[in-house]
Amino acid sequence: MLLIRNANIKTMAGPDLKNGCLLLENGKIAAVGQTVDAPEGVETLDAQGRLLTPGCVEAHCHIGLDNEGMRWEGMDYNEIVEPLTPQLRAIDSINPQDEAFGLALRGGVTTACTGPGSANVVGGTFAIVKLAGKRVDRMILRAPAAMKCAFGENPKGCYGHDKRQSPMTRMAVAALLRELLLRTLRYRDDKEAGKNPAFDMKLEAMLPVVNGEIPLKCHAHRADDILTAVRIAREFGLKLTLDHCTDGELIADELAKEQVPVFVGPSLGGKTKVELRNKSFTTAGTLYRAGLTVSIITDAPVIPLQYLPLAAGFGRSADGGGVARHHHQPGPQPRHRCACRQS
């Protein structure tokens, strides 16, 4: 057990506590309050007025799949061989010995949703993991957590521009995804009808998507790509998240009608491609005020994961603190969390 006292605590579930106490038991929070009951002789740490918060959660990154300080040797996040690879699983590439894990923990980030990049139209499944541990199997909170898909420049560039093959256009990106979804539905229907279709690893991986068990995790920057992702999800009755959502500020009213979770970022850094021309720290606040569930992301290693609190701070500052002010208002409120590499 560990008792932390005299801390300024951001509980994220109620009022802040000045000179409050927090009790840890077996690595988990057992109690928090202005005062807490603790056994006599418990190990005590005097925070001396320092800030104490829950661990930050990253909603989209590639930690463990794109290893710190490596070139091709540690780049295990994009299988740029064919544009549809739903059968790939993040947990088979995550390297817990990547030094980025320790750096993130020291920066206050304790949990991350990590997975494939956006070279492929469908890239494989993400996993939600704790960042402390030696073996990924014991770090998993949820796997599969989502199915990665990508719209816009990245799949067009990796295949159309670099390989001179489909998809060369946004039409082809959408068509490839639709075709995969239609094949999955037919495969599911045949299985349910007892027709015993030949085993297909790709379609098996897509079944949780069409069954509504996991969302499509949609990499989309440009406004039209964002709305194409929404259009396809609505056509097939799928859950989705909009990851990056760089142009979201331009279509906030339309996204508010759809009530789709948005993961905004990475907003630190330069505008390294055309899709990022409208990158802004104000996007998260605009979408939050429109009534959407918003998460600020690093897309690590685009922004190193330990700088997630910094990215969240910039987002709050650009919004004039409005996001934080909404947190303690009574009644139902949109949620905002600290929390996909553009790759």
Per-range role (PLM):
Residues I9, A13-T53:
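Histidine-rich, glycine-flanked metal-binding segment
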Residues N67-I94, R135, K148-D162, V210, ...:
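Active-site gating loops and adjacent loop-to-helix segments of metal-dependent hydrolytic enzymes
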Residues E68-G69, M75-I80, T85, P215, ...:
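His/Asp/Glu-enriched, well-ordered alpha-helical/loop segment
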Residues W72-V122, S166-Y187, A193:
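Alpha-helical scaffold segments that flank or form the walls of functional sites
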